């Protein structure tokens, strides 16, 4: 049984703003690469208890896709502790997707949060 949550605009905001790692796959039923990538995403969701996996159907949620600047599908977004760490378009091969998941988990979030705070302070 897959551990993937379907998100809409309201649930997206709460899902990505909390603690922990959330990987979001923006997809569409008519998208060939999305269908190719789906088993890779599902396998990762079943094997990685340290990460929350979610999907957004862009046809059911066009406003969310627009707000998230999704211009092609599939688009992957990786959030950790409420901060967007990665966004890319295109289906990833299994090994590359696993590398992305490991890299997101290995990020020093104290350093990232310090950089975000410094940037916000400099912008007034």
Each PLM stretch: what is its role?
Residues 19-20, 27-30, 72:
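Short pre-active-site segment immediately N-terminal to redox-active cysteine/selenocysteine motifs
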Residues 109-124:
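CheY-like receiver
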Residues 19-21, 36-56, 62:
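Conserved helix-turn-beta segment immediately C-terminal to the redox Cys motif
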Residues 72, 78-111:
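Non-catalytic, surface beta->alpha helical segment in thiol-disulfide oxidoreductase systems
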Residues 26-40:
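Conserved redox-active cysteine motifs that mediate thiol-disulfide chemistry
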Residues 4-22, 62:
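A short beta-strand-turn-helix
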């Amino acid at each position: 049984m897959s551990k993937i949550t379907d998100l809409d605009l309201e649930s997206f905001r709460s899902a990505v703003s909390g603690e922990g790692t959330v990987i979001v796959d923006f997809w569409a039923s008519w998208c060939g690469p999305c269908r190719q990538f789906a088993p890779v995403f599902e396998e990762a969701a079943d094997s990685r208890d340290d990460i929350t996996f979610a999907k957004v159907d862009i046809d059911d949620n066009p406003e969310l896709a627009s707000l998230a600047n999704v211009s092609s599908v599939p688009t992957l977004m990786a959030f950790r502790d409420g901060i967007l760490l990665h966004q890319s378009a295109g289906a990833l091969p299994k090994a590359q997707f696993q590398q992305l998941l490991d890299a997101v988990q290995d990020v020093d979030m104290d350093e990232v949060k310090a950089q975000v705070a410094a940037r916000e302070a400099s912008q007034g």
